[in-house]
Amino acid sequence: MTDIEKMISGLIYDPADKELAEMRQAAHILSKKYNDLYENDDDRNKILDKLVPNRGTNVYLQGPIQFDYGCFTEIGDNSYANFNLTCLDCAPVKIGKNVFMGPNVSLLTPVHPLHVQSGKTQDEDIDKHK
């Protein structure tokens, strides 16, 4: 099982996995580019096409936005997010149709180990990538 499969299944995974790290960095770069554009700039939709490819029509994200991956998020038609949408989509996030989100909404899927031994293993994995 790959670390991506583990992650989206809610299992312990290596967040420093090369493929995951590259995907996360790409999403962070696209989020930054989106945030740097004026809201009437047509390039915002081109960025969202790459960042959140699983979205319906007439989706508007006010910005600023922040996604961990973007590709694990689905947004239904006619949905709107006000300022400061944060979506840590380490597991699938599904936003339905006709959803209106206020400012400062955070959709957070990461789960950190609660058992000491599990935490030690993950800490050791993180330390080796410093």
Which role does the model predict for each range below?
Residues 1-58, 114:
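Terminal amphipathic alpha-helical/low-complexity segments used for targeting or macromolecular assembly
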Residues 65-75, 80-130:
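Flexible, glycine/small-residue-enriched loop-and-beta-strand segment within the central core
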